[in-house]
């Protein structure tokens, strides 16, 4: 599966140059540390701009800093005891270990799954309705009881709470918390 993370698109020299740019290092410093040629540094920065989709070095740095902060937050969310999910384009983009356990998936087994496949048919309309309302920035319930569908086909009762719309990889997404109800 193709990664959404800009850092993953860089080859090793680009990654080193990007690290130096994020740290605020000058082109002269980058020349001495990575390339001995100013032209090669400039060419590498051009490739970084293309791969990040930024129109300036400052814009690329801002995107990379935001991405790094997001990755740090995801590492924290991975440790949460409640299920945490990020949904973007109606697909699971992030699911922590607790959510994978609740749904019966192996680690990293939920990324890429359509949201509707995690709900039994009777819960799908409600879930999609709440997702669409949040994506449009309209009011939606902050928490609600729902049935979820596990990997093996069994259904469980759960509580879903949404933090609402967030930015994930530079685009709108929904952050949700799922707690299994016993």
Residue map of PLM features:
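Sensory modules in modular signal-transduction proteins
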Residues: 69-95
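PAS-family sensory domains
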Residues: 93, 142, 149-151, 155-157
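PAS/PAS-like sensory domain cap-loop motif
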Residues: 99-110, 121
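Short loop/turn elements at sensory-signaling interfaces that couple input to output
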Residues: 160-174
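Terminal output helix/cap of sensory domains in signal transduction proteins
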Residues: 122-150
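N-terminal capping loop/helix in small sensory signaling domains highlighted by a polar->aromatic N-x2-3-F motif
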Residues: 27, 95-99
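Recognition helix of helix-turn-helix DNA-binding domains
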Residues: 24-59
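Basic, Lys/Arg-enriched C-terminal extension of HTH/homeodomain DNA-binding domains
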Residues: 2-7, 50-74
């Amino acid at each position: 599966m193709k990664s959404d993370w800009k850092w993953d698109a860089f080859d090793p020299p680009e990654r080193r140059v990007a690290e130096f740019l994020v740290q605020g290092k000058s082109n002269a410093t980058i020349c001495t540390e990575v390339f001995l040629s100013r032209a090669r540094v400039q060419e590498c920065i051009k490739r970084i701009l293309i791969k990040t989709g930024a129109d300036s070095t400052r814009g690329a740095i801002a995107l990379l800093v935001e991405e790094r902060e997001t990755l740090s937050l995801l590492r924290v969310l991975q440790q949460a005891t409640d299920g945490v999910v990020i949904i973007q384009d109606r697909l699971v983009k992030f699911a922590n270990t607790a959510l994978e356990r609740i749904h019966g998936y192996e680690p990293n087994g939920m990324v890429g799954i359509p949201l509707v496949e995690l709900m039994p048919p009777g819960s799908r309309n409600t879930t999609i309705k709440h997702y669409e309302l949040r994506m449009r920035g309209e009011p939606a319930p902050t928490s609600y009881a729902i049935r979820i569908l596990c990997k093996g086909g069994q259904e469980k009762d759960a509580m879903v709470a949404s933090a609402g719309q967030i930015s994930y990889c530079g685009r709108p997404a929904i952050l949700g918390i799922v707690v299994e109800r016993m």
